[in-house]
């Protein structure tokens, strides 16, 4: 499957997360993003070094600035289960705006065409690192990394595109 690209409508799919009342929710991506400007950024795995020390903190630190430029939602996405994503989110007590969501089986990652095969590292099939800017479900920015790199998908990269 070809990777998601600028001009595409983001596919619909199901993701899971814990809401503000600590209740497990399952929702469609379209229900979360329709009619909104949304950043959907993906990471290969919760608690992994680059994701935990660079990618996620950048979006947390820049969240207010992103929102001031019209972003309604900032969603962190990973092929992990929702319990892992909840625990990972709690390691950022300063976070007020980034929602941590799970693609437990990797099905949505497949729909995006953004799988990263990390079986040789014992991690299975994960998501490539990426940052998408969606405007009412349409991809307006698609910053997708090669392999496990972190060169084009930061919060600063999205800010430059806004």
Curated annotation (Swiss-Prot):
A single cellular component GO annotation: cytosol
The protein's Enzyme Commission number: 1.11.1.25
Entry annotated with the keyword Membrane: no
Major localization listed first in the record, in broad terms: cytoplasm
Catalytic activity: [glutaredoxin]-dithiol + a hydroperoxide = [glutaredoxin]-disulfide + an alcohol + H2O
Residues annotated as catalytic: 51
A Pfam family this chain is assigned to: Redoxin
Domain Thioredoxin: 4-162
Localization in the cell: Cytoplasm
GO terms classed as biological process: cellular response to oxidative stress
Subunit and interaction comment: Monomer.
Role, per record: Reduces hydrogen peroxide and alkyl hydroperoxides with reducing equivalents provided through the thioredoxin or glutaredoxin system. May be involved in intracellular redox signaling. Thiol-specific peroxidase that catalyzes the reduction of hydrogen peroxide and organic hydroperoxides to water and alcohols, respectively. Plays a role in cell protection against oxidative stress by detoxifying peroxides and as sensor of hydrogen peroxide-mediated signaling events.
Other facts noted in the record for this chain: The active site is a conserved redox-active cysteine residue, the peroxidatic cysteine (C(P)), which makes the nucleophilic attack on the peroxide substrate. The peroxide oxidizes the C(P)-SH to cysteine sulfenic acid (C(P)-SOH), which then reacts with another cysteine residue, the resolving cysteine (C(R)), to form a disulfide bridge. The disulfide is subsequently reduced by an appropriate electron donor to complete the catalytic cycle. In this 1-Cys peroxiredoxin, no C(R) is present and C(P) instead forms a disulfide with a cysteine from another protein or with a small thiol molecule.
Protein name in the entry: Peroxiredoxin-2B
Organism: Arabidopsis thaliana (Mouse-ear cress)
Lineage of the organism: Eukaryota, Viridiplantae, Streptophyta, Embryophyta, Tracheophyta
